[in-house]
Amino acid sequence: MRGFNLLLFWGCCVMHSWEGHIRPTRKPNTKGNNCRDSTLCPAYATCTNTVDSYYCACKQGFLSSNGQNHFKDPGVRCKDIDECSQSPQPCGPNSSCKNLSGRYKCSCLDGFSSPTGNDWVPGKPGNFSCTDINECLTSSVCPEHSDCVNSMGSYSCSCQVGFISRNSTCEDVDECADPRACPEHATCNNTVGNYSCFCNPGFESSSGHLSFQGLKASCEDIDECTEMCPINSTCTNTPGSYFCTCHPGFAPSNGQLNFTDQGVECRDIDECRQDPSTCGPNSICTNALGSYSCGCIAGFHPNPEGSQKDGNFSCQRVLFKCKEDVIPDNKQIQQCQEGTAVKPAYVSFCAQINNIFSVLDKVCENKTTVVSLKNTTESFVPVLKQISTWTKFTKEETSSLATVFLESVESMTLASFWKPSANITPAVRTEYLDIESKVINKECSEENVTLDLVAKGDKMKIGCSTIEESESTETTGVAFVSFVGMESVLNERFFKDHQAPLTTSEIKLKMNSRVVGGIMTGEKKDGFSDPIIYTLENIQPKQKFERPICVSWSTDVKGGRWTSFGCVILEASETYTICSCNQMANLAVIMASGELTMDFSLYIISHVGIIISLVCLVLAIATFLLCRSIRNHNTYLHLHLCVCLLLAKTLFLAGIHKTDNKMGCAIIAGFLHYLFLACFFWMLVEAVILFLMVRNLKVVNYFSSRNIKMLHICAFGYGLPMLVVVISASVQPQGYGMHNRCWLNTETGFIWSFLGPVCTVIVINSLLLTWTLWILRQRLSSVNAEVSTLKDTRLLTFKAFAQLFILGCSWVLGIFQIGPVAGVMAYLFTIINSLQGAFIFLIHCLLNGQVREEYKRWITGKTKPSSQSQTSRILLSSMPSASKTG
């Protein structure tokens, strides 16, 4: 068969070749085998003999031009059939068809292959069909770290997850460069083609896996506080960690505030051992496990404005006193409180003391229990019932016992203000004791309001301004108490009138009122601007010859005594006595009977002497200003001294008792302070000048303007007193003015702002005068003959001694008015001090010859001689003028 085909193919080729080159036109042979004539059929056709005929048929792959399969027409041609344009394509899918003459050739497209191979033509063995080539079977088709994906007729390479295509290669992708690759609190770990997320220490994955990718899982904080911290501590969980903190009241054993070491312990802090005390002064600290508590000692209570919780706990003194506060510095009372057996002589005394303290302790020891004024008052009644037994005690024991009792009653009353009971009793009336109290609410809302409190016929009148001045910080209240029978034991033997030390032995004293007491909350108890008025009922009618004395009970190292300081008599009648006091205290009235001539005598001497001094000072000032013959620096010093003394004594007479206006009284006291100090400083100036004069006797013109200027002397004489007054007023402005006189306060020690400089000047003057007398003794013998013959040496010596009194001896006498010679000292002080102006006029005017001559000319009307020797007058004028330069 194969050979036949080849033969046929060859024959066709030969015929084609022949036909193409030899194509003679001849008439077909109709007889026999017609197909012998090759020209009968066109090229690419076959001739087929039939009976008596033939027909032509185009070969395979060709088609007749007339569309007939068999034809004889010589004009018909066989045209090549384009099989590749047929549909479907003869080569099949995924192939390419190439038309050939009479046939076609099949080849597979790229990516496909046929078992017969490409360039297949019909007739070749096998069936041509194109199937896809799987390129991915070849390992080198795609680069490393990529995946090959086969497709129909092709393939593709894609980088694996975790890689990125770059320059026909697959490079690793660093997923950790993206902050969103892992969740919060995780660490990203990049690997080749992959990455992993690991939770940070202190966190764990929500998926439960150690490593993970992406945000499908989260890192959740591990709560380490379940069992990581020791006892008495607090565990604080933080993101990824934790720390331990000891509870308040505990401290870590390693000293670190926050710790994680499990070996650390939280140990209790003993806050009560700290210095200074955690609770503050006057407190009691009690330590507890992890805490402590604060309390206050007796006599103190917690400050309501602070708290232990806030760390500002403090104890402030209660409104009332407790046992520790009222015990005076007395050996007998101390023995009663030592807890040991007392001497038989003190048994009764200690029993009375302990009875009083038992009532007071009930109030002080229980700081929260309310205090009933009625109950505590009745508790003191048994003490007053036994007051007659106090007469067997010594004076010191009686005064100590009275001090304890009076202060205990005051403390109990103040306690009732601080811890009042539900049923407040404003007044308690008993046979031996009356108390009327008043809590201040709206009573003092208006100005100039006064309150009256009455007890046993006695009365206390107090203004709201005084209550406000008491500086009460909590409950404000006042009370008035009157005791029955206490005047019999606290009698006149406990009184010493320090304001009238000159009373004679003929004066008799007696108690003539009940002992009363004013009680008020607040720390300030005395020195009030507005006085407190006490009206005390006389036990016996006052006689005309009797002088009442208001006395207050003052405690001292020996227990206590009556004193007249701080109170004055406003009015006295037969039935009552009105006292004006600048203090809240226990009071009574003592009647003094007998001759009081010495007090009156001093009053007359003082006022008459001051009036005489004022007249003399006016004359001296006029003399220094008008007498030209003696006008020099020395007379200027005398002039300033006289002016200051004149103003001081005038203001003293006119304003010492102007106490109605508080501010005006303080101003008067301030001016008196300044003027009297100025007198002393000008006296000091004169002492210095006198010293210089005697020391420089040989140099007559020793006081020239170029040595000492008057301006400097004035600055000293007026400036230093002003400095003392300004400093004193700045330190204690309330020291100026008292309730009974406009002078410096003698009860607070403020008087030393005057006495201090005075004593200093006196000491300096004494030293200068002593030195002056010594120099005078040495120099008088060397004075030139001309001066010594003037017989003025005795006058100079007299002036030196007289200057001693002018420069302060009288004030020395005033300071030493104590002891048995107090009366004599008082007389000397009053006489010399009141006549100080007269002494100045006598020494510097009447004993000066030039002045006497001027007086004579003024009186007689004669004119001054034209020529007069001044040489003999040098020492008489005490100091030459600067213009007298010889």
From Swiss-Prot:
Q: Does Calcium count among this protein's keywords?
A: yes
Q: Which spans does this entry mark as compositional bias, Polar residues? A: 863-886
User: Any idea where the GAIN-B domain is?
Assistant: 431-597
Q: Which SMART domains match?
A: EGF, EGF_CA, GPS
Residues in domain EGF-like?
Answer: 31-79, 80-131, 132-171, 172-220, 221-267, 268-316
For the Extracellular compartment, the record's topological domain ranges are 21-599, 657-666, 732-747, 815-829
In terms of superkingdom, the source organism counts as: Eukaryota
List the cysteine pairs that form cystine. C35-C47, C41-C56, C58-C78, C84-C97, C91-C106, C108-C130, C136-C148, C142-C157, C159-C170, C176-C188, C182-C197, C199-C219, C225-C235, C229-C244, C246-C266, C272-C285, C279-C294, C296-C315, C550-C579, C567-C581
Free-text tissue specificity from the UniProt record = Expression is restricted to eosinophils.
Give the Gene3D superfamilies listed for this entry.
Answer: 2.60.220.50, Laminin, Rhodopsin 7-helix transmembrane proteins
Q: Which CDD domains match?
A: 7tmB2_EMR, EGF_CA
Q: Which UniProt keywords apply?
A: Adaptive immunity, Calcium, Cell membrane, Disulfide bond, EGF-like domain, G-protein coupled receptor, Glycoprotein, Immunity, Membrane, Receptor, Repeat, Signal, Transducer, Transmembrane, Transmembrane helix
Where does the signal peptide begin and end? 1-20
Q: Where in the cell is it found?
A: Cell membrane
The GO annotation for biological process reads: adaptive immune response; adenylate cyclase-activating G protein-coupled receptor signaling pathway; cell adhesion; cell surface receptor signaling pathway; G protein-coupled receptor signaling pathway
| Entry GO terms, CC | external side of plasma membrane; plasma membrane
| InterPro entries linked | EGF-like_Ca-bd_dom, EGF-like_dom, EGF-type_Asp/Asn_hydroxyl_site, EGF_Ca-bd_CS, GAIN_B, GAIN_dom_sf, GPCR_2-like_7TM, GPCR_2_EMR1-like_rcpt
Glycosylated residues: list them: N94, N99, N127, N167, N189, N194, N232, N258, N312, N366, N375, N448
Molecular function per GO: calcium ion binding; G protein-coupled receptor activity
A Pfam family matched in the record: GPS
User: According to the UniProt record, where is the region Disordered?
Assistant: 862-886
What family does the entry list?
Answer: Belongs to the G-protein coupled receptor 2 family. Adhesion G-protein coupled receptor (ADGR) subfamily.
Function, as annotated, reads: Orphan receptor involved in cell adhesion and probably in cell-cell interactions specifically involving cells of the immune system. May play a role in regulatory T-cells (Treg) development.
| Annotated protein name in UniProt | Adhesion G protein-coupled receptor E1
- Give the originating organism: Homo sapiens (Human)
